Amino acid sequence: MNTMNIIDLHCDTLIKLHEQGCGLEDVQGHIDLDALRSGGALVQCFAVYTPTHEQVHKHKITTGPWEYFNTAADIFDREMEKHKELIRPVRCAADIRENMDAGRISALLTLEDGVCIDGKME
C-alpha cells in the first residue's frame, strides 16, 4: 500500500504557542506533534502571522510587528531544538529528503501578510 506524504503549506501554530505559553507537544487547537506524526506529515509550514496594531491585544502581543516576528521565530527555533529527533527546520529540497530518509518531519518557517516588514523589502 502506498502512503501519501502530506505537505501542509500553512498553520497558525506559532501564534498559539505564544498565546498559550506552551510547546508543540501540548498546544491546543492547532497542529501538534501527535497530529503531525499520525497524519503522515512530510512538511509543515509554520506561518508567522503578525497582527496589525489593532489586533495585537487579542493575541497577547505587547511589542511591535518586527519584534513579534523575532519572538515567533525564536519560538520556532526553540521548538525545533526541543523536538529535533522528530522535526527539523528546512531551507531546501535536500533538507526535506534528508529528514524524510531519517524518518523526521520537515518544518518550514514562513511569513504571512508581511506586516512586520512595514512595506520595506531591503
List PLM regions with ranges.
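N-terminal hydrophobic targeting/anchoring segments and the immediately downstream early-domain regions
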Residues: 1-122
